[in-house]
Curated annotation (Swiss-Prot):
Stated name of the protein: Lipoprotein signal peptidase
InterPro entries: Peptidase_A8 (IPR001872)
Record-linked Pfam families: Peptidase_A8
PANTHER family in the record: LIPOPROTEIN SIGNAL PEPTIDASE
Pathway(s) the chain acts in: Protein modification; lipoprotein biosynthesis (signal peptide cleavage)
Example GO molecular function: aspartic-type endopeptidase activity
Length: 167
């Protein structure tokens, strides 16, 4: 691991966790639990507490069980980041986003025993998506970055093997 690579990783973590925690702090101190602030016809800030993981999965786990599960996942993600090839920039960036998002939600879980969620997408009274937060968004964007890079590599290899095979 190069010093430059590790510096970018740390900067990414500081930014993702810092932004996530700053917004959550604002939500907690400016919105009562259960209140909504419409932003757009399909988007609101809606202050809720999530005692589970994504989409309230594992909400039956104990507080410490969820923390332990998150720590195990974080250790695995750190191992993946360290062992991902340097030229796979998008994957390393994606893992940084995922790790930062996981740390942001872990901080909530340790400090408050729940995660602060506040982003609500909806279509009138027809469709409501699960309420989530920026940390969840970072995790999702990280997964998209990794999948994008892997698909790009797979397509490139497929094209290369077709050219090689057709000769």
């Amino acid at each position: 691991m190069t010093r430059k690579s590790f510096s970018f990783f740390l900067l990414g973590l500081i930014l993702t966790v810092g932004i996530d925690q700053t917004v959550k702090y604002w939500i907690m101190h400016n919105m009562l639990l259960g209140t909504e602030i419409p932003l757009l016809p399909f988007l609101s800030l809606y202050h809720v507490r999530n005692s589970g993981i994504a989409f309230s999965f594992f909400s039956s786990f104990s507080h410490w069980g969820l923390i332990a599960l998150t720590l195990i996942i974080l250790i695995f993600l750190l191992w993946l980041w360290k062992n991902t090839e340097y030229n796979k920039f998008l994957s390393r960036f994606g893992l940084t986003l995922i790790i930062g998002g996981a740390i942001g939600n872990l901080i909530d879980r340790i400090c408050f025993y729940y995660v602060i969620d506040y982003i609500l997408f909806y279509i009138d009274d027809i469709f409501y998506f699960a309420v989530f937060n920026l940390a969840d968004t970072f995790i999702t964007l990280g997964v998209i970055a990794i999948v994008t890079e892997e698909l790009r590599i797979w397509i490139k290899e497929k094209r290369h093997s077709k050219r090689t095979f057709s000769r």
